[in-house]
């Protein structure tokens, strides 16, 4: 919550996966096709996973597009015999807060932003519900309300020692200018 922290290496590959099926993430369209992996993209995926796995004992990446490409990444982890290391941390945020952020940054209508949130969220939840990978669910709003508690639970899930002093480097309650969205009307197809 202090900045975006998207991993650019993974974001580029996620964009390539989506572009391969004619989807541009910057179009903000909510009808999103299932990505396909070409040999060239697969080689890039293998290379980046091997690079990070060799360089770091504990590593991961953050990119919202991974909600759409998670199945393709799991295939790579499986082929590299790294599937035992895979743990998913799914951080959700209220639909209206995401929509407000997209409106502020990209002048996207609120309803379109909420539909996009729904597409991303349904895709990743469907994946998590139909697979047995260890998954930790947390909310963006919860992290802002009690960062140390949420981060400690996340580190427990990762089976890694937690140093509470790192929280101040990564969590800034003022960074979220889109609010929590508690006062907004959400369309029925989003709230169901």
Region locations from a protein language model:
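PAPS-dependent sulfotransferase catalytic core
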Residues: 1-43, 171-179
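The conserved 3'-phosphoadenosine-5'-phosphosulfate
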Residues: 1-5, 90-96, 100, 129-191
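Glycine-rich phosphate-binding loop used to anchor ATP phosphates in small-molecule kinases
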Residues: 37-75
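Alpha-helical elements of Rossmann-like donor-binding domains used by nucleotide-donor carbohydrate transfer enzymes
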Residues: 44, 72, 119, 123, ...
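A structural motif corresponding to the C-terminal end of an alpha-helix
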Residues: 50-57, 123-136
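Catalytic phosphate/metal-binding cores of nucleic-acid and nucleotide-processing enzymes, i.e., regions
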Residues: 57, 95-98, 111, 124
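Conserved phosphate-donor/acceptor-positioning beta-strand/loop module used by diverse small-molecule
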Residues: 62-66, 81-103, 117
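Lumenal/extracellular "mature" regions of secretory-pathway glycan-modifying transferases
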Residues: 104-119
């Amino acid at each position: 919550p202090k900045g975006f922290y998207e991993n650019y290496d993974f974001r580029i590959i996620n964009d390539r996966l989506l572009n391969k099926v004619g989807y541009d993430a910057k179009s903000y369209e909510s009808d999103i096709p299932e990505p396909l992996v070409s040999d060239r993209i697969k080689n890039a995926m293998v290379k980046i996973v091997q690079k990070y796995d060799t360089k770091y004992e504990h590593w991961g990446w953050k990119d919202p597009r991974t909600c759409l490409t998670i199945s393709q990444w799991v295939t790579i982890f499986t082929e590299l015999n790294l599937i035992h290391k895979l743990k998913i941390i799914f951080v959700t945020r209220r639909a209206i807060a995401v929509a407000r952020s997209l409106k502020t940054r990209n002048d996207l209508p609120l309803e379109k932003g909420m539909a996009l949130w729904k597409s991303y969220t349904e895709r990743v939840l469907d994946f998590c519900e139909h697979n047995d990978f260890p998954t930790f669910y947390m909310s963006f709003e919860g992290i802002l309300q009690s960062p140390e508690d949420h981060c400690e639970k996340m580190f427990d899930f990762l089976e890694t020692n937690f140093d509470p002093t790192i929280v101040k480097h990564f969590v800034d309650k003022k960074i979220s200018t889109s609010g929590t969205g508690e006062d907004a009307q959400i369309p029925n197809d989003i709230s169901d």
